[in-house]
């Protein structure tokens, strides 16, 4: 399984995808709902996995080194190639539980003589792994923060207004459902803050742009170009969507409202306060959002413990306060969410 947003990114960098790909019902988040395994199996998970393994083994015949990114699964696949390999444990962090449960197999894979190096996603995890006997572990930085320089994309921002980034995620159809929920929250936030105070910019994946018109119709918004507009007799709310301005939107935002994984980590890495909302999933549920707060700390605030309805969104929007602006041209916010 591979996120189709990643496929597009690889293609843009002229990096070929050598094996078959498919979107599975679980989205790769079986630990959040193990029952989705049966749906994955029904969608051909076993045959897909076997095809991937065959592709990897054949391709490895012409390789000198395997770079595996993920968890025990990719580490095991790298081991199976019989080549030297390096593992980046991107899916594991000691911030979740204080100590990673490595089990019986993963230490053998990481301590194998063909495993040349293990990279951890943070310094705490590197220390934990070393204490558990994985002496070749290092933390040298977080790769997801490497390419977040603003490109100079014109976001048509008004400098005197607060900028709020909207991050619905990258996996469809979930990202579409997430955006519907986020648009409901945008309406409530605009009521609290005022439409002449804030402006909204959404960073979406290219495939979601094709769904914007249907999303607008379902939520009572108007759609034109890359702009979603909600009209009332008193005011208009605009959410302008971009498929190619993720870094620019994050860099210019004063607050992030999102339902995503890596994108939220990147926002926090840039020092942005973040509000998240549990959704239907399969990936961004309350369980995921709660774990994310353990990973990222108080920079992330989760609204509620279940899928938000209109009443909850209205209630929590009134608890969001933006009282401090220092200095005038560089807004900073204290975001308070009280339950």
Placement of each model-derived feature along the sequence:
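Nucleotide-activated sugar donor-binding and catalytic core shared by glycosyltransferases
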Residues: 1-339
């Amino acid at each position: 399984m591979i996120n189709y947003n990643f496929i597009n990114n690889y293609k843009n960098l002229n990096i070929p995808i050598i094996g078959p790909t498919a979107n599975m019902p679980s989205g790769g988040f079986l630990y959040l709902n193990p029952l989705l395994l049966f749906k994955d199996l029904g969608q051909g998970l076993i045959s897909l996995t076997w095809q991937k393994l065959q592709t990897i083994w054949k391709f490895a015949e012409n390789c000198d080194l395997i770079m595996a990114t993920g968890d025990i699964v990719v580490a095991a696949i790298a081991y199976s190639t019989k080549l030297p390999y390096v593992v980046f444990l991107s899916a594991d962090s000691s911030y979740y539980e204080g100590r990673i449960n490595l089990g019986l197999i993963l230490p053998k894979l990481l301590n194998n003589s063909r495993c040349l190096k293990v990279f951890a996603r943070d310094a705490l995890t590197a220390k934990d792994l070393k204490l558990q006997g994985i002496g070749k572990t290092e933390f040298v930085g977080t790769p997801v923060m490497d390419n977040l320089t603003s490109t100079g994309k014109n976001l048509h921002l008004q400098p005197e207004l607060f900028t709020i980034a909207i991050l619905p995620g990258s996996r469809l159809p979930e990202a579409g459902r997430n955006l519907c929920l986020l648009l409901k929250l945008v309406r409530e936030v605009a009521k609290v803050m005022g439409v002449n105070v804030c402006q909204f910019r959404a960073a979406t994946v290219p495939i979601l742009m094709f769904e914007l018109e249907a999303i607008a119709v379902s939520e009572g918004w108007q759609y034109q170009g890359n702009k979603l507009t909600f009209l009332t007799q008193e005011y208009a709310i605009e959410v302008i969507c971009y498929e190619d301005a993720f870094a620019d939107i994050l860099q210019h935002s004063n607050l992030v409202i999102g339902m995503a994984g890596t994108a939220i980590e990147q926002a926090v890495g840039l020092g942005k306060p973040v509000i998240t909302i549990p959704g239907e999933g399969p990936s961004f549920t309350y369980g995921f959002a709660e774990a994310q707060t353990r990973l990222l700390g108080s920079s992330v605030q989760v609204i509620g413990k279940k899928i938000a309805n209109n009443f909850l969104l209205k209630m929590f929007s009134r608890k969001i306060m933006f009282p401090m602006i220092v200095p005038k041209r560089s807004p900073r916010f204290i975001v308070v969410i009280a339950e």
